[in-house]
Design a protein with these regions (language model features):
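Flexible "arm" and connector segments at domain edges
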Residues: 1-61, 65-111
Length: 111
């Protein structure tokens, strides 16, 4: 599936009664909530002796993707453009791949 196709299909389940502002707020809160659920799965694996529940984690990652698509939609952006811009930023930051020295020397304004 193409990224923008996912965004379009995912947004068919968006509440149409929400304003653009409410969609953005909901998306950011949803990203935080679902990220917390993913963190909890990893925490239980890392610190509490549980097996890593990959199936559950994959479902939470899917929910995170949905809220990311919602945020992009609220901003009238498409995910493909966001992801391409992110890769371009990372290529400039780490042209030869990740480098600890370059990471440590990163300037504060390099977001």
């Amino acid at each position: 599936m193409e990224i923008n196709e996912y965004q379009k299909l995912a947004m068919t389940t968006l509440n149409p009664a929400l304003s653009q502002k409410d969609v953005l707020i909901n998306s950011v809160m949803g990203l935080c909530g679902e990220s917390g659920e993913a963190i909890d799965i990893v925490k239980k694996w890392l610190a509490q002796g549980h097996e890593l529940d990959k199936e559950h984690l994959a479902k939470e990652l899917g929910d995170i993707a949905w809220y990311l698509a919602e945020a992009a939609t609220a901003l009238d952006l498409n995910l493909e453009d966001i992801l391409e811009a992110n890769i371009e930023k990372l290529k400039k930051r780490y042209p030869e791949g990740f480098d600890t020295h370059r990471s440590l020397e990163r300037k504060k304004e390099d977001i």
